[in-house]
Curated annotation (Swiss-Prot):
Main location: cytoplasm
Names of the cofactor(s): [4Fe-4S] cluster
Alphabetical list of SMART domains matching this protein: Elp3
Protein name: tRNA-2-methylthio-N(6)-dimethylallyladenosine synthase
Catalytic EC class: transferase
Domain annotation Radical SAM core: ranges: 145-378
Organism of this sequence: Francisella tularensis subsp. tularensis (strain SCHU S4 / Schu 4)
Family: Belongs to the methylthiotransferase family. MiaB subfamily.
Keyword Cell membrane: no
Coiled coil: none
One Gene Ontology term of the molecular function aspect: N6-isopentenyladenosine methylthiotransferase activity
Location of the TRAM domain: 380-442
E.C. numbers: 2.8.4.3
Residue ranges occupied by any MTTase N-terminal domain in the UniProt entry: 5-122
Amino acid sequence: MKEQKKVFIKTLGCQMNEYDSARMHEVLNEHFDTVKTDDYKDADIILINTCSIREKAQEKVFHELGRWKGLKKTNEDLIIGVGGCVASQEGENIIKRAPFVDLVFGPQTIHRLPEMIKQKQKTQQSQVDISFPEVEKFDYLPEPKAEGAKAYVSIMEGCDKYCSYCVVPYTRGPEVNRPFEDVLAECAILAEQGVKEITLLGQNVNHYLGPMENGQTADLALLIHFIAEIDGIERIRFTTSHPVEFSQNLIDAYATVPELANHLHLPVQHGSDRILINMKRNHTILEFKQKIRKLRAIRPDITISSDFIVGFPGETEEDFQKLLDLVKEINFDQSFSFIYSKRPGTPAADLPDDTPMEVKKDRLKRLQDLLNSNAQIISRQMVGTNQRILVDGTSKKDDNILSGRTENNRVVNFKGDKSLIGQFAMVKITESLPNSLRGELI
């Protein structure tokens, strides 16, 4: 009989990391019969799945590790591990800075966690494996287990874009595409377990080129068409996309696949062609707007969110105004926006940057104020409309109130029977609040 171990996993960063954290627990459970715990003080294994997109996210890792250091005094068998992109970037340096850490593993070596733990216990030496093995982690995925009506499905890993500011190609490695039939099989299993909404994940998900058993290659549009045919799957999302690979095939899918959510997250990063060139984004603002126009010709009411970087080296007030103009023209919905964070080893780190931080903070506030205004207007326009809600559970504030999300990712709270959890429900929107909507069951 396997010894049961309590596992605490803290996840920082993107949805891919959330997916990876779920895989960590499943891999460990196959070998050690693990149970999750929300209290790190009660755990036998503590893992932090890290993000290195921004400097603050990196420092947060060592802050968390500092909180856990003292636990070793009362539990000498405790295993502490660091995974994710900071692990890939820092490697052995994590052990040097925090010698009490037992494991350092990258996104591609999650499947080796059980063996790393055994080696640590056998040798009493910290284990580091941040390689990009020839055999991808997709070959070692455990049987998928649904947790609710929504699920993430990873379809590709890594990125070949090498945008000048980004560490992802260095931490996640080159693009690796998961076989087409394997993705469909996982989606079918999840559907049998009650999953109704699938979010397809990849660092550059719309560049998916999955090998097929017949020797051909499937793009994201073809994959979406096939997933939509699986009984039980009623809503499909994908993230994160790059404008260059937002193809006509994918745009056309919005006309023929009603299961595709009426919302798109498409990071543009900036509104100035000059800045986009320095970012090595390989597209112009005109090309971006042309693709959005084609999409809205098919789905006029689709909402579009994005990612924005403010204060990139060399950004002028004129550049920033072009960004604001783009946000107004496209009418971007709720989006992510950050001040540029210099990442060591990236080309942008060597660019001269003489814009004062006070100016960058002011620009970020102006951008966020505009984005928030857009989002509030979109929310208010939804009042009086009927929305199809996937009911996730109950409200965080009131266990007697149901909660779910619209196609455009709005949280809606409404009264209803708990038997609706995990199902779709039609709800009339009655009120717009700053961070959510209220509604009535139809």
